Design a protein with these regions (language model features):
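Conserved C-terminal structural/oligomerization subdomain of aldehyde/semialdehyde dehydrogenase
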Residues: 81, 105, 142, 196, ...
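CheY-like receiver
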Residues: 70, 98-99, 155, 283, ...
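Thr-Gly-centered strand-to-loop micro-motif
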Residues: 53, 59-60, 110-111, 143, ...
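Gly/Ser/Thr-rich beta-alpha loop segments that engage phosphate groups in nucleotides
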Residues: 30-33, 56, 64, 93, ...
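ALDH superfamily catalytic-core signature
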Residues: 115-254, 283, 317, 364-365, ...
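Structural signal for hydrophobic packing residues in well-ordered secondary-structure cores
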Residues: 7-15, 76, 80, 103, ...
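Rossmann-like NAD(P) dinucleotide-binding subdomain of oxidoreductase/dehydrogenase enzymes
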Residues: 6-12, 16-151, 204, 274
Length: 382
């Protein structure tokens, strides 16, 4: 539904370009590189605003999810889109590198890991290309003592185990107010015991498989290398076919521990506690990332006080993963820059017009009816 919403929203915005962005024009050719975790949604985020502003697109999907993009290209053909407007190029990282360095590309829009994003920024430096980066995250999930704990637990299931934690804005760093920490952890462990694990295509399950053995190995090695804190693993046998990693909770970590600082990109939740709201803000901002954050509290004044202090691109209150095509999404720090969606996203696919619309001709003042001495002595509200 959100992918569809992006096309619907941007189709409407395309009709308003002349009236709302009269001094803007299309950038030109936009090179776009998307990841494998949301192949259709990421495609919609990239292509819809680019086409709405009159650009052409060269898009490279991830190696594992090329078929989604190729099917979309066929839909474009059936819809009558002119050849050359949307171009899908499949391949590995070498193909993406060719797109990034091609001299005829006017803009690069990339969603993926921070490491690759850093290399893309280096490659485009000095080239004059426009650049949008939406990178990794280590998003804090803050639970205050006055929060509805049952709702916060359910929200956390969606925040970290949706799509097996393979989400850039996953709430993977749990910060719990000390007065309710024991109760919250108990409720969370009870909920973890009831998580349904199985076929990702089955809509009734909570957690599916990781994308491939490489990702499974990475998650496993990061967790096994950690010796701090207390680990709780969802009980039960994992399905044999597929890269299923059990949902894992690790509590009692130090803010400087590797698992509290680095993006795991899997179904692993790490946690620590805080005593005061100011400490919660300090812990939340104690990372090189800044993509998203979630705050759970029944006190609206507390929420409105905490949210602006969080160094993230988006803050959700008493909810998570709440997105809309009309709202710009993006990060700060090493989570990237630029926005996708909303007016901010549209502006990223435009440039100022070099030739403005001509002004209407104004007739010269003949002097008739003016002051006799030629001096205007009327009162002015300066």
């Amino acid at each position: 539904p959100l992918a569809q919403r992006h096309f619907y929203y941007h189709a409407g915005m395309a009709q308003l370009m002349d009236s709302e962005l009269p001094d803007a024009q299309a950038l030109g050719v936009c090179g776009q590189i998307i990841p494998w975790n949301f192949p259709l949604l990421m495609l919609a985020w990239k292509i819809a605003p680019a086409l709405a502003m009159g650009n052409t697109v060269v898009l490279k999907p991830a190696e594992y999810t090329s078929l989604t993009a190729l099917l979309f290209a066929d839909i474009c053909r059936q819809a009558g889109l002119p050849k050359g407007v949307v171009n899908i190029v499949t391949g590995d990282g070498a193909v993406g590198e060719m797109i990034v360095t091609h001299e005829d590309i006017d803009k690069i829009a990339f969603t993926g890991s921070t490491a690759v994003g850093r290399r893309i920024r280096e490659a485009t430096a000095g080239s004059g290309k426009a650049l949008t980066l939406e990178l990794g995250g280590k998003s804090p999930y803050i639970v205050f003592d006055d929060a509805d704990l049952d709702s916060a637990v359910e929200g956390l299931v969606d925040a970290i185990w949706f799509n097996q934690g393979q989400v850039c804005c996953a709430g993977s760093r749990l910060l719990v107010h000390e007065p309710v920490a024991d109760r919250f952890y108990a409720k969370l462990r009870t909920r973890m015991e009831k998580l349904r694990i199985g076929d990702p295509l089955d809509k009734s399950i909570d957690v599916g498989a990781l994308v491939d053995p490489v990702q499974y190995k990475r998650v496993s090695e990061m967790v096994e290398a950690n010796t701090a804190g207390e680990r709780f693993v969802t009980p039960g046998q994992m399905p044999e076919n597929g890269c299923f990693y059990p949902p894992t909770l690790i509590t009692g970590l130090n803010p400087a521990d590797t698992l509290m600082q680095e993006e795991i990109f899997g179904p692993v939740l790490v946690s620590t506690t805080f005593r005061t709201p100011s400490e919660a803000v300090q812990l939340a901002n104690n990372t090189r990332y800044g993509l998203a954050a979630t705050v759970w509290t029944e006190n609206v004044n507390l929420a409105l006080d905490i949210a602006p202090q969080l160094e993230t691109g988006i803050v959700w209150v008493n909810g998570t993963n709440m997105m809309d095509a009309a709202a710009g999404f993006g990060g700060k720090r090493e989570s990237g820059f630029g926005r996708e969606g909303g007016w901010e996203g549209l502006a990223g696919y435009t440039k100022p017009k070099t030739a403005q619309k001509p002004l209407k001709e104004i007739e010269a003042f003949s002097g008739e009816g003016g002051p006799e001495d030629g001096i205007d002595r009327t009162a002015k509200l300066y």
